[in-house]
């Protein structure tokens, strides 16, 4: 991992969403230099399912060698942002670095995204980033080491990244467009850049999206903290860049990336918005039967599902059903399968003992999954991760995403039997 150099000693770093995850990791990295950290986040009281508050984060920052100012901030609230900025300036004398980390996510298509979720993502991601930057900029302009760092992706206009989750993409790209505009607007005064991970990072959000076992396909938050630290060390002239964590660390001489892996040697899940995957990710993903999202398939096409493979898969699923599984799941799934042995199938995990069958379910499905028969068999046999299938466009989901994630647990139980 990247060693600290003391470069940020005495600097004041304002970080949104710093009570946990990547935001807290960046805070702790800076704290090791003796930086002043403003923890601008909503969590003042412990969440029943998520670890950490602004106050527990403050204690960790102090233990790491930094000074901490916990501030209750919902980035949708302009008054809370302004108040936190004023407190930071009063306590530490100014602001040197701003990290716009707070973000909201919903990986749902247009018709399945409630207006409330659209507003949340737009107001947290785009508007929150813009307003926090606006509030900090007058003080950043006075700093000799001024940086704004948005945790947002490169502006990739490939339609793939819009069709599955249009609202989320627009909201994240709004953060990236702040980089594009502000880097030019404040050139010479403030370095404005974006940072994005090459692979999935293990956070509470990733656990929610990927379900049980996804952590083995992720890297630790430390890789993003180290990459951010590299950026903070650069001069103001380093601006307007869309940086990938792995790339900048390679430039710093880091060669062993297994130290960042949750499970060293395990194939990693590529993150959103990146068309090209490094050879390491592609090779490891292929060895597990997965296909990165836009890998060009110049090799032989995947073999078709053997005759009756879908029926056999459902038979094994049915034999494995139990009242406990039904009780834990409580959902009806409908599968729209294309290709050989295709058609409409259902998996009823609401009725006593569970049930499967060909055709539409008698009750309305909670989740409708559309994919090829080949990918269906691969998913239930563990050769294709549902998260990877969804990200690559191989799997389309309509309905309740939380219930869709529950199905992955059942798939994991099938792996040893298929």
Curated annotation (Swiss-Prot):
Subcellular location: Peroxisome; Mitochondrion
Residue sites binding NADP(+) per the record: 17-23, 42, 74, 172
Residue ranges annotated for the SCP2 domain, each copy included: 306-415
Active-site residues, record numbering mapped to chain: 168 (proton acceptor)
Superkingdom per UniProt: Eukaryota
Chain positions with N6-succinyllysine modification: 318
Listed GO CC annotations: mitochondrion; peroxisome
Described purpose of this protein according to its UniProt entry: Has apparently no steroid dehydrogenase activity. Controls bile acid (BA) and lipid metabolism in response to nutritional cues.
Protein name per the record: Hydroxysteroid dehydrogenase-like protein 2
Protein species of origin: Bos taurus
Encoding gene (name): HSDL2
């Amino acid at each position: 991992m990247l060693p600290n150099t003391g470069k940020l000693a005495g600097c004041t770093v304002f970080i949104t969403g710093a009570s946990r995850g990547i935001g807290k990791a960046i805070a702790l990295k800076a704290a090791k230099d003796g930086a002043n950290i403003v923890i601008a986040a909503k969590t003042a009281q412990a969440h029943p399912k998520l670890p950490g508050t602004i106050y527990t984060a403050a204690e960790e920052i102090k233990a790491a060698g930094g000074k901490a100012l916990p501030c209750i901030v919902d980035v949708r609230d302009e008054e809370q942002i302004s108040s936190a900025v004023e407190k930071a300036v009063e306590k530490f004398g100014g602001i040197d670095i701003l990290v716009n980390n707070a973000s909201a996510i919903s990986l749902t298509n247009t018709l399945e995204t409630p207006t409330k979720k659209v507003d949340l993502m737009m107001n947290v991601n785009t508007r929150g980033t813009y307003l926090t930057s606006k509030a900090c900029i007058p003080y950043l302009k006075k700093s000799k080491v001024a940086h704004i760092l948005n945790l947002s992706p490169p502006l990739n206009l490939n339609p793939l990244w819009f069709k599955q989750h249009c609202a989320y993409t627009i909201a994240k790209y709004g953060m990236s467009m702040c980089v594009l505009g502000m880097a030019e607007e404040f050139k010479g005064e403030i370095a404005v850049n974006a940072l994005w991970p090459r692979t999935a990072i293990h956070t509470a959000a990733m656990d929610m999206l990927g379900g049980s076992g996804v952590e083995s396909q992720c890297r630790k938050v430390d890789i993003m903290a180290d990459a951010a630290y590299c950026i903070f060390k650069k001069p103001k002239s380093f601006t307007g860049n869309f940086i990938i964590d792995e790339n900048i660390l390679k430039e710093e001489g880091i060669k062993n990336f297994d130290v960042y892996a949750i499970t060293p040697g395990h194939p990693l899940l590529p993150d959103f918005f990146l068309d090209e995957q490094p050879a390491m990710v592609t090779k490891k993903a292929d060895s597990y039967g997965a296909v990165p999202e836009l890998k060009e398939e110049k090799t032989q096409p995947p073999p078709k599902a053997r005759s009756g493979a879908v029926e056999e898969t459902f038979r094994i699923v049915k034999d494995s059903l139990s009242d406990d599984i039904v009780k834990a799941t409580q959902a009806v799934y409908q599968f729209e399968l294309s290709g050989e042995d295709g058609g409409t199938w259902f998996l009823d995990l609401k009725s006593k003992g569970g049930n499967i069958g060909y055709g539409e379910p008698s009750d309305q499905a909670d989740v409708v999954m559309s994919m090829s028969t080949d990918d269906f068999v691969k998913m239930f046999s563990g050769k294709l991760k549902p998260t990877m299938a969804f990200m690559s466009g191989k799997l389309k989901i309509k309905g309740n995403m939380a219930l869709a994630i529950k199905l992955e647990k059942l798939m994991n139980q099938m792996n040893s039997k298929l």
